Amino acid sequence: MESTSCPRKTYAVYNTPYLTEGLTLLPGYGRMQGVVFRRDNPRFQHCQSVAEAMNAAAADPDCLMVNRNAGSGTRALVDRLLEGARPAGYMHQAKSHNAVAVAVAQDRADWGMAIDTVARQYGLGFLPVQPERYDFVIPASRADRPAVRRFVGLLRGETGQRLLRELGFDPSPV
């Protein structure tokens, strides 16, 4: 599986509508969301696009998905792609990208939505859906605290930027 770069101009943004007064958005890093599956799963072996993978999953009632938890950005993306469909396993919810990948890798589910870095970590197949930003929300009243300032320094510093790139993320703030 190839690393997927995240073009800054096409990031999906889920979090800004939830910001309330007194909260500050700290741009984080880019990552790629996509459909994950076991490479040896015959349903997905020849799929070249997300549409093909979704159609393959929908065509087989025994094909189980593992979903993300309601309220997560990934769940919003999944629901948009499914357009109201509720495939087998839809109610099986995982709370993290790693949990989705583990369920698929352990054959407890056939497919799910996770980020490319996690798919690589578990040796899963990956079909990119869209890049997104992972941002941080900080109460404005705490922005000057030493721990917050150190975190921002790490995130924006040369070492932090290099480490994010090595992990497959796009550290460029938007």
Residue ranges of predicted features:
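Short beta-strand-to-loop elements that line the ligand-binding cleft
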Residues: R68, R86-A99
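Short, structured loop/turn "capping" segments at alpha-beta junctions
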Residues: F44-C47, G84-Y90
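A conserved helix-loop-strand patch within extracytoplasmic ligand-binding domains
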Residues: N15-A70, Q161-R162
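Periplasmic-binding protein-like
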Residues: T20-L23, P27-G34, F44, Y122-G153, L155-P171, ...
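Secondary-structure junction motif
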Residues: L64-L82
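A ligand-binding cleft/hinge motif common to bilobed small-molecule-binding domains
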Residues: E2-P17, A101-Q130
